[in-house]
């Protein structure tokens, strides 16, 4: 899938604009602070109903405007189009529309418009808390395993019930046992989907990484959230007193993690910034390959400040891999000349100059 058209109104400093992007490579260039990243933010808002720059949406809404709106016409992989719209009012009201109908959740957007973001904060995938890596993992499972979301919802409900009981002791023993059983069943299902996904992801990630950078010995492993040699019901029983003292369930899929190690060390502790960026890119690109295999469609990639942290050789290698995905890519940079040699002649490349919130399409830089 790809965006055929996108209309942006009152997003940060951007002037109202309608863009008809290339189905492949789109480069947004201009000075720092011109609004390039705000274009990526608008696409992200359309696909996930949230910003990647702020946990609050009020800062996204242009000063003195009551609401921001993003509309997109999506070319579907199976043919035909779908119209998506997201509107956020400063007062807090949020509207998601899909083909003229109100949507119930942002998950419906995510299914229609799978997005991959690579930006300066992407280092957090390696350096940050396990929650960030779980989100990465579950994004991938969600897009390849249709049974994942119902199981995840059951898991969340069972966890809420158990944690409430741990804090307040409001469940009778029979109800407590029933919710523990439901928690264990949902956990086993989630764990199976995650393990299968990692099994498929690892060889694709390793191959992709080898085309970007030489990092012999880097390993990716999955920790499910409890001892691999014990059943979860046994772990829950043995940790009950501790769970009651803490007020929440300590073992289970909600504690899962992905571990990247190099020479027995946490990879984030010894890799340079450039190497970390390439590892994250390899993970994101590998996910895109799995989405394409499972759905016969493509992710849309948002790459903020692609040239940063990378020398010319690695910039070219990253551009080549993004190009080989045959998906739609939106890239920001200050100097588009740095990407001049990154693409094959036959690949459609659209250039957009961004200056003080105004966006102008310019000529293909290879012409």
UniProtKB/Swiss-Prot annotation:
One GO term in the molecular function aspect is:
ATP binding
Its transmembrane ranges are none
| Residues holding ATP | 30-37
Q: Gene Ontology terms, cellular component aspect? A: cytoplasm
Lineage, top-rank taxon, reads Bacteria
Question: What is an annotated GO biological process for this record, any one?
Answer: DNA replication
State where the protein is found. Answer: Cytoplasm
Q: Please name the Pfam families in this protein's record.
A: SMC_N
Primary location recorded for the protein, binned into one broad class: cytoplasm
Question: Which keywords does the record carry?
Answer: ATP-binding, Cytoplasm, DNA damage, DNA repair, DNA replication, DNA-binding, Nucleotide-binding, SOS response
UniProt-listed InterPro entries: DNA-binding_RecF, DNA-binding_RecF_CS, P-loop_NTPase, RecF/RecN/SMC_N, RecF_2
To which protein family does this belong? Belongs to the RecF family.
Q: What does this protein do?
A: The RecF protein is involved in DNA metabolism; it is required for DNA replication and normal SOS inducibility. RecF binds preferentially to single-stranded, linear DNA. It also seems to bind ATP.
Descriptive protein name: DNA replication and repair protein RecF
* Protein source organism: Pseudomonas putida (strain W619)
């Amino acid at each position: 899938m790809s965006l055929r058209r996108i209309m942006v109104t009152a997003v940060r400093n951007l002037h109202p604009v309608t863009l008809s992007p290339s189905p492949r490579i789109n480069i947004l260039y201009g000075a720092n602070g011109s609004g390039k990243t705000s274009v990526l933010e608008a696409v992200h808002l359309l696909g996930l109903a949230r910003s990647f720059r702020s946990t609050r949406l009020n800062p996204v809404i242009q000063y003195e405007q009551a609401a921001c709106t993003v509309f997109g016409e999506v070319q579907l992989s199976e043919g035909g189009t779908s119209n998506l719209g997201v509107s956020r009012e400063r007062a807090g009201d949020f509207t998601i529309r899909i083909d003229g109908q109100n949507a119930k959740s942002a998950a419906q957007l995510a299914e229609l418009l799978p997005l991959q973001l690579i930006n300066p904060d992407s280092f957090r995938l390696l350096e940050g808390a396990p929650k960030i890596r779980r989100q990465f993992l579950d994004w991938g499972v969600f897009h390849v395993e249709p049974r994942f979301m119902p199981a995840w919802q059951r898991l969340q409900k069972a966890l809420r019930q158990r944690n409430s009981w741990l804090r307040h002791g409001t469940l009778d023993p029979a109800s407590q046992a029933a919710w523990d059983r439901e928690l264990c069943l949902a956990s086993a299902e989630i764990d199976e989907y995650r393990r299968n996904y990692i099994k498929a992801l690892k060889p694709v990630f390793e191959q992709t990484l080898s085309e970007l950078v030489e990092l012999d010995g880097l390993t990716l492993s999955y920790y499910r959230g409890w001892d691999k040699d014990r059943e979860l019901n046994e772990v829950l029983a043995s940790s009950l007193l501790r769970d009651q003292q803490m007020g929440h369930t300590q073992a289970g899929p909600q504690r899962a993690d992905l571990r990247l190690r190099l020479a027995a060390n946490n990879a984030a502790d010894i890799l340079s910034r450039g190497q970390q960026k390439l590892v994250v890119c390899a993970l994101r690109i590998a996910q895109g390959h799995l989405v394409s295999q499972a759905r016969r469609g493509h992710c849309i990639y948002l790459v903020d400040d692609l040239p940063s942290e990378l020398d010319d050789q690695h910039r070219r290698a990253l551009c080549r891999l993004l190009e080989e995905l045959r998906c739609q890519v939106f890239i920001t940079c200050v100097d588009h000349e740095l990407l001049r040699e990154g693409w094959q002649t036959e690949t459609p490349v659209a250039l957009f100059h961004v200056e003080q919130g105004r966006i102008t399409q310019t000529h293909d830089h290879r012409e």
